[in-house]
């Protein structure tokens, strides 16, 4: 499982180093094979170990194809998905088109989301993180099922 927010840097070629604490799990789960695609809701990228992405593809394939919203989601997620591999230094290259989508430049945040990572521009992450915190602190903003969650 992947958790935590990690400040990382992209080099001039668009490569980033996967934090070392995640590398062993990624290599053991999927031989360092990753899938990177857009997040269809937030202006960031989703980074999946290959085995986790294959579960997502199975679910996407099972969606009724006559529904336009299903086809739209399939086009966005699968059409933008790129197969990548960690190199010997634990780095991977984010293609220019995906860097443009997430407005990634030099400073980024790699945020563990249990089964995947989100890759954010650092400024965008800071803004959305602050907005999320402010929103959840509003009276009545927390759903009942989350109120029962013991933290």
Curated annotation (Swiss-Prot):
Residue ranges of coiled coil: none
GO biological process: negative regulation of DNA-templated transcription initiation
The UniProt record lists the keyword DNA damage: no
CDD domains hit by this protein: MraZ_C, MraZ_N
All copies of domain SpoVT-AbrB, residue ranges: 5-52, 81-124
Primary location: cytoplasm
UniProt xrefs under InterPro entries: MraZ, MraZ_C, MraZ_dom, MraZ_N, MraZ_sf, SpoVT-AbrB_dom, SpoVT-AbrB_sf
Record's keyword terms, sorted: Cytoplasm, DNA-binding, Repeat, Transcription, Transcription regulation
PROSITE patterns in the cross-refs: SPOVT_ABRB
Top-level taxon of the source organism: Bacteria
Localization per Swiss-Prot or TrEMBL: Cytoplasm, Nucleoid
One term of GO molecular function: DNA-binding transcription factor activity
UniProt cross-references to SUPFAM superfamilies, sorted A to Z: AbrB/MazE/MraZ-like (SSF89447)
Quaternary structure annotation from Swiss-Prot or TrEMBL: Forms oligomers.
Family per record: Belongs to the MraZ family.
Annotated protein name in UniProt: Transcriptional regulator MraZ
Biological source species: Pseudomonas fluorescens (strain ATCC BAA-477 / NRRL B-23932 / Pf-5)
Gene that produces this protein: mraZ
């Amino acid at each position: 499982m992947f958790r935590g927010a990690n400040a990382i840097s992209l080099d001039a070629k668009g490569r980033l180093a996967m934090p070392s604490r995640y590398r062993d799990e990624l290599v053991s789960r999927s031989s360092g094979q990753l899938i990177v695609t857009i997040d269809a809701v937030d202006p960031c990228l989703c980074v999946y170990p290959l085995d986790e992405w294959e579960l997502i593809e199975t679910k996407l394939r099972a969606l009724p194809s006559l529904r336009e919203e299903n086809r739209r989601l399939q086009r966005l997620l699968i059409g933008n998905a790129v197969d990548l591999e960690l190199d010997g230094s634990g780095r991977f290259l984010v293609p220019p088109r995906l860097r443009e989508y997430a407005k990634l430049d030099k400073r980024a945040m790699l945020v563990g989301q249990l089964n995947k990572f989100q890759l954010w521009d650092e400024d965008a992450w800071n803004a959305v993180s602050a907005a999320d915190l402010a929103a959840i602190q509003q009276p009545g903003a927390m759903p009942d099922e989350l109120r029962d969650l013991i933290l």
